[in-house]
Structures are given as C-alpha cells and as structure tokens.
Amino acid sequence: MSNYVVIDLEMCRTGNNYTGEEVGLPNETIQIGAVRLDENLEIAGQFMTYVSPQYGYISDFIHRMTGISGRDIQNAPQMKEALEHFMSWLPSPDIEMISWSYTDRAQIEREMEVKCIRLDGMEELMRGWIDCQEEFSRKLKNRKRFNLTDALVIADIPYVGEAHDGLTDAYNTALLFKKLRLDPDFRINEYYRKSLEPKSPALTFSLGDMLSGMGVAADSAQSCSADRN
C-alpha cells in the first residue's frame, strides 16, 4: 500500500504595498498543515508550520476566518524554508500526496515559480497528487464540487476542530479519504440520502383551474335541472 500524506494550506491575499498580481501571485501561503497515514490509513503523524508571506499580510477577514494573526507569522519561516521543513518531515520519497482539491497543489507550484524556489524531490511529489474533492464527487456520481465541511456531513463524519486551520483541515480530509478507500458501500448521511429520493408528484393545478372546474360543474347542474323541467 502506498504511503499517503494529506496536506492543507491556508492563504492570505497579497498586500496593497506589494501588488502580488504584478508577479502573478494573488495569494500567499501562511500555514501548512499535514498528516501522515499508515498502511491502514490511520493517522500516524502530523506537521504544521506557519509561513511568513513575502507580499501579503493578515487582513481582519483572514484573521477571523483562520485564527492566524500577524504575531503567528512574525518569526515564521518563508516559503522556501517551510517547504524544506516539510520535505524533511516526509517519511520516505515514495509518497502520494492528497489534498481536498488541486488548489493546494497549484498554489505550491505557483509560489515556487514566482519565488524561484528549487527543491529536490518536489517535482516527483507533485506527480502523484490525489484530488480528494474530485474523488468524493465521483463516488457520489455528482458533478458538483462540494466543500470539505459539506462533504463530511454527507459522509456522516463528525468534523474535528475548527475549519480553516491547515492541520485540522488536513486531519478531516484524511478521515474522509479513509472512508472513500475502505468503505465499499460508502454509507452516507441518512437525511442526505432521503433528500435524493424521488419526490411525490406535486399538485400542479392552479386556483384558476379549480374555479374553472367548478364552473363546468355548475353549468352541468343547471343543464340537468333544465332537462328535468
């Protein structure tokens, strides 16, 4: 069985003083969270580091959403050093990476390109990337792209921790990935399952239809009365 590592990034927008759009980098990583899975897809290790952005800053919105503050990233490593720490944490070079969507993979690739980061083994790591969001949609036979919180509800997996924390999101993605791979029936939330069942045919007549019918009935009654007379 392959070695799996689930990763999740938290990001901020690039700042006004350093326009990230000018270098093609509208977002920057401010946190990397990851968990390692053993041969039974149980969580066997975890990794977390904050990342100091080169262009961006922690806005009030990002702080409220992620809980990450300027103090958290003040002495944090920049992206190159953070990725070096992450690579050294990996248990072996034979790793399949997992994230909730390809957004995390694309962000790493883009930041490495813009910041001229070169790391041994990173190119190989990118090749075996698994998009858990896509795998989840395929399992449901649904083209919709679900967010992680909704996917966990549908899969009947209690959410652990607070959303938009890199380590927490990686942990919850790992729980969902395990169910996708090890539960052949992939039992889903009963309420969600019932919502997919065909509904009873709706009443389609209108008030006008009803009154029109009443008019026909009245005309028929009058006609019968006239015939009797």
Model-based region annotation:
Residues L175-N229:
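Acidic two-metal-ion nuclease catalytic site recognized across multiple nuclease folds
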Residues S2-E113, G161:
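Conserved non-catalytic scaffold segment of RNase H-like nuclease domains
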Residues M11-R13, E134, N172:
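Short, glycine/acidic-enriched loop or turn micro-motifs at the edges of active sites
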Residues I7, I130, T168:
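Active-site flanking residues adjacent to catalytic metal/cofactor-binding acidic residues
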Residues D165-K178:
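Acidic, divalent-metal-coordinating active-site segment for phosphoryl/phosphodiester hydrolysis
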Residues I117-K139:
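Histidine/lysine/aspartate-rich catalytic loop segments that bind and position anionic ligands
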Residues Y50, Y57-S59, H63-T66, G70-I73, ...:
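Active-site-proximal helix-loop-helix substrate-binding element of RNase H-like nuclease domains
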